[in-house]
């Protein structure tokens, strides 16, 4: 007695069952880390979530999660600035920096505040501005507990505790804790220079030779 061949439909059903079971196993494996990954291309996101940084710089040993980020970083060591501004010729390591720079020439301000409508060239400037409306002050001084809306303001404030004065006057050597104080101080020297110059001109003029009226002879002012 010859056994009948299995129908094609039954064969397909069996293969579909195996495929479904494999899919379930894969799904369980993909949920191992507490998240569902639909596509294999999402592996890079999983790696970043686990703080895995396999791409290491040979110059400074800094690590990165993506090879493209390492490639951009290595330009700092090589000094290669391949992204050049067509308007002024200034060059940059990254294309994103060039895009931000180009807004100086174009005047473009794509980041707009929803509260007051003021626009900004960079997203970081918008974030800082929005703290005016929200009152957020995320930067706190460890010494006195005072809070600030910008990190630069905290750095300036901390100098009141440390006594650091990194801004030095090139004319007299006096140091200041803030660049704005140095600029204000430099105005004193700029005002002094014209006064000294005018004084020298006056002294020179008093010693220039002049003609005595009616004598036809030269005389020097202040000399007999």
From Swiss-Prot:
Residues 1-34 are annotated as: Disordered. Its main location: nucleus. It is found in: Nucleus. Keywords: Acetylation, DNA-binding, Metal-binding, Nucleus, Phosphoprotein, Repeat, Transcription, Transcription regulation, Zinc, Zinc-finger. The keyword Repeat applies. In the embryo, expressed in developing craniofacial structures including dental epithelium of maxillary molar tooth organs, tongue epithelium and muscle, and craniofacial bone osteoblasts. In the adult, expressed in mesoderm-derived tissues such as skeletal muscle, heart, kidney and liver. Intermediate expression in spleen, thymus and brain. Low levels in endoderm-derived tissues such as intestine and colon. The modification N6-acetyllysine is found at residues 18, 23. The modification Phosphoserine is found at residue 49. Gene3D superfamilies: Classic Zinc Finger. GO terms for biological process: odontogenesis; regulation of DNA-templated transcription; regulation of gene expression. A zinc finger (C2H2-type) spans 55-77, 83-105, 111-133, 139-161, 167-189. Belongs to the krueppel C2H2-type zinc-finger protein family. This is Zinc finger protein 22.
């Amino acid at each position: 007695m010859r056994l009948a061949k299995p129908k094609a439909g039954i064969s397909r059903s069996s293969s579909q069952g195996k495929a479904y079971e494999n899919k379930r196993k894969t799904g369980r494996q993909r949920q191992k880390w507490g998240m569902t990954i639909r596509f294999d291309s999402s592996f890079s996101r999983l790696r970043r979530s686990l703080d895995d940084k396999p791409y290491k710089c040979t110059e400074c040993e800094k690590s990165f999660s993506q090879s493209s980020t390492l490639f951009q970083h290595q330009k700092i060591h090589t000094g290669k600035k391949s992204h050049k501004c067509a308007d002024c010729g200034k060059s940059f390591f990254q294309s994103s920096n060039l895009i931000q720079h180009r807004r100086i020439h174009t005047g473009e301000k794509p980041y707009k505040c929803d509260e007051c409508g003021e626009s900004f060239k960079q997203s970081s400037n918008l974030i800082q501005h929005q703290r005016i409306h929200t009152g957020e002050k995320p930067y706190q001084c460890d010494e006195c507990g005072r809070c600030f809306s910008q990190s630069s303001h905290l750095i300036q404030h901390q100098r009141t505790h440390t006594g650091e004065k990194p801004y030095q006057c090139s004319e007299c050597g006096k140091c200041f804790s803030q660049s704005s104080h140095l600029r204000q101080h430099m105005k004193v020297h700029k005002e002094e220079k014209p006064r000294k110059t005018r004084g020298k001109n006056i002294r020179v003029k008093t010693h220039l030779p002049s003609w005595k009226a009616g004598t036809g002879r030269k005389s020097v002012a202040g000399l007999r």
